[in-house]
A protein has these predicted regions:
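Conserved "HGTGT" condensation-loop signature of ketosynthase/thiolase-family condensing enzymes
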Residues: 1-78, 84-170, 188, 216-224
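C-terminal catalytic subdomain
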Residues: 171-172, 176-224
Length: 224
């Protein structure tokens, strides 16, 4: 619907994915830490087979990984009781979720998501933030379409960094546990950058189930 040729689309997507690869190179927990350029990502080869034209392996989620992550959530009172230093605290400000129809054939089109638009914008509204106020963003990145649709619905530029892990291709795609990794990495970055704001998105199904969270070392002004 954007009027691109296949070659133009491949170039755009591979450039975006090269940016994800650069982030993975800086993430000590990423699965593929070799920084790959756009040409390497879009060119099929022995280690980059064509999965579903025009998307080779390096444009798809990588679930051949051995990864685990965990977070600890507790009240302020419990954190103090346990002696957790406040420099390690990261507050969840907002959480929202929404659901598109399961049946892909019943959707108005294949390039939009009302659920992302409604729940994502509601999360930012509840947090009192706009997209330009977000210092770190991780958009669920199983495939390029997921990032492009979410960015369009949320008003996020594809020119900014849209991952903190390197995404499901390079950071690693441990099936349903990926967002635990993106939240964990977001916590690390926010601890290193007190006062900054982070935004994490999640997805399940065929771009069907969506969830959003805003995080910061600063306490939220209202209740979670």
């Amino acid at each position: 619907h954007q009027g691109e040729t296949i070659e133009e689309h491949q170039a755009k997507v591979s450039t975006m994915w090269a940016g994800f690869s650069q982030v993975a190179a800086r993430n000590p927990n990423a699965w593929i830490r070799d920084a790959l350029d756009a040409t390497a990502i879009r060119t099929p080869g022995k280690t980059n087979r064509m999965v579903s034209f025009p998307y080779p392996k390096l444009m798809n989620s990588n679930n051949s990984v051995d990864m685990a992550s965990a977070i600890i959530m507790c009240s302020v009172a419990k954190a103090r009781e346990l002696g957790v230093d406040e420099s390690q605290w990261v507050y969840p400000w907002v959480g929202t979720d929404a659901h598109d129809t399961y049946s892909v054939s019943e959707r108005d089109n294949l390039y939009s998501s009302p659920a992302i638009r409604i729940a994502g914008q509601r999360a930012l509204e509840l947090a009192g933030l706009g997209v330009d106020d977000l210092d770190f963003v991780d958009v669920y990145s199983c495939f390029p379409v997921a990032v492009q649709v979410a960015a369009a619905e949320l008003g996020l530029s594809l020119d900014r960094e849209l991952t903190v892990t390197g995404g499901l291709t390079f950071g690693g795609g441990p099936l349903n546990n990926y967002v635990m990794h993106s939240i964990s990495r977001m916590v690390e970055l926010l601890r290193d950058n007190p006062g900054k704001k982070g935004f994490v998105t999640a997805n399940g199904g065929f771009l069907t189930k969506h969830a959003f969270g805003v995080y910061s070392t600063e306490a939220p002004k209202g209740d979670y």
